Amino acid sequence: LDAAQEARDQKRVRWIGFHGEKSPHIALKLLARGFAWDFACMPLNPFDATFRSFEKQLLPEMIRRGAAVIGTKALAGGAIPAGRLIKSEEALRYAWSLPVSSVLVGCDSSAVLKKTLKSATGFKSYHAGEMDALRQKARPTAGDGRFERYKTTQEYDGAPGLTAHGYTVS
């Protein structure tokens, strides 16, 4: 972090941020070190509100600090079964309705890109009642993290993160 701060002071780097998807508790420990982060990337979707919630725990802290928030995993990393539970358009609108600077959306085909762009065209924020309705819709299957495997498995973890948290790297 000292090197990052030095680079920012020398105007070689403009913004310094972090990306966390495993647990908001890990990110909050990072914030407790006192570094002045400019932004954080975090998963934000209707399922997140029920299980290890970045929306409830980390998002408010970043806003309190005046830092930008970049949403990720609006579609739960592609884990939401097509046409079931929450539609992709609903999940995107949910993430865009939160107090974020941007939302990164993974597109693995031109069809997904077109669908995402169509959802963004004419976007209107959900009101609080609509946001809560989507959280409630997700709640019955969200409590165990089954649609947020980046939180519950090591499938998405790189070797540095695994090593830092005491896991064996194979």
What are the functions of these language-model segments?
Residues 33, 49, 55-170:
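Structured C-terminal cap/extension of enzyme domains
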Residues 1-53, 57, 63, 67-70:
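Glycine/proline-rich, positively charged
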